[in-house]
């Protein structure tokens, strides 16, 4: 069986319908190939529990990994208000999903458990995809564990409803906030990783001196709107109007 990777997107009134559409769109592209792994990118508008339930109902007991996001992406650009389901088919490789629901509360212990799970894999792990809670928890300890590993690791912090302070990770039949989900890949599989960003150095650098939850309230001891007004050349009293109000 030749390897094949596809992705389908779906939209609906709820997560179940959107996920059902996404799976069907992906399966149509696979043709006669059978999926061996599912990766799910859930729009923040939907219940991730509903999405996991719908995907599992259609695909059975496949390894499932994913996270919530403000907007899934495709080659055609952003796909807002949607669910994306990527399917990988083929043989000769291994995929295992590990799930830790207590990442936000016990970051140090989870980082240790993650490193141990990689070392204890019977089949050598060649690469790992990670998704961690994007609001709660400290990912720095996890990054320290990754630095000590001689393998490809990629991933990031889940996005979603930052106003409510809730982002979600998906792993197996689990879907919760405050969690860490790891997809371990091995066997006859070639992996390549690349990274880039569109930011340009502006020369501005400020230290966050005060914050509440996800809201920055102080930069170098100054209210952020005053900092941005000075940097962008706007009067401080225009903080309630664009573009200052957008920061």
Task: Explain the meaning of each model-derived region.
Residues 1-58, 62, 67-71, 75-247:
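Small-residue-enriched flexible segments
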């Amino acid at each position: 069986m030749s390897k094949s990777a596809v992705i389908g997107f779906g939209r609906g009134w709820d997560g179940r319908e959107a996920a059902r559409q996404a799976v069907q769109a992906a399966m149509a592209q696979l043709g006669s190939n059978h999926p061996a792994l599912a990766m799910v990118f859930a729009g923040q508008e939907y219940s991730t529990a509903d999405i996991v339930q719908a995907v599992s109902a259609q695909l059975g007991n496949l390894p499932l990994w994913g996270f919530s996001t403000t907007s899934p992406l495709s080659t055609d650009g952003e796909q807002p208000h949607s669910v994306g389901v990527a399917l990988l088919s083929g043989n000769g490789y291994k995929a295992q999903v590990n799930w830790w629901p207590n990442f936000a509360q016990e970051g140090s212990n989870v980082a240790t458990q993650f490193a141990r799970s990689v070392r204890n894999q019977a089949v050598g792990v060649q690469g790992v995809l990670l998704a961690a809670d994007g609001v709660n928890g400290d990912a720095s300890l996890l990054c320290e564990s990754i630095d000590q590993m001689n393998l490809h690791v990629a991933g990031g912090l889940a996005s979603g409803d930052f106003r409510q302070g809730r982002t979600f990770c998906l792993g197996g039949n689990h879907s919760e906030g405050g969690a860490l989900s790891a997809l371990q890949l091995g066997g006859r599989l070639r992996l390549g990783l690349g990274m880039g960003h569109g930011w340009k150095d502006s020369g501005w650098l400020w230290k966050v001196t005060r914050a509440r939850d996800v809201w920055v309230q102080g930069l170098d001891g100054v209210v952020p709107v005053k900092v941005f007004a000075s940097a962008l050349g706007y009067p401080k009293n225009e903080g309630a109007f664009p573009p200052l109000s957008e920061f």
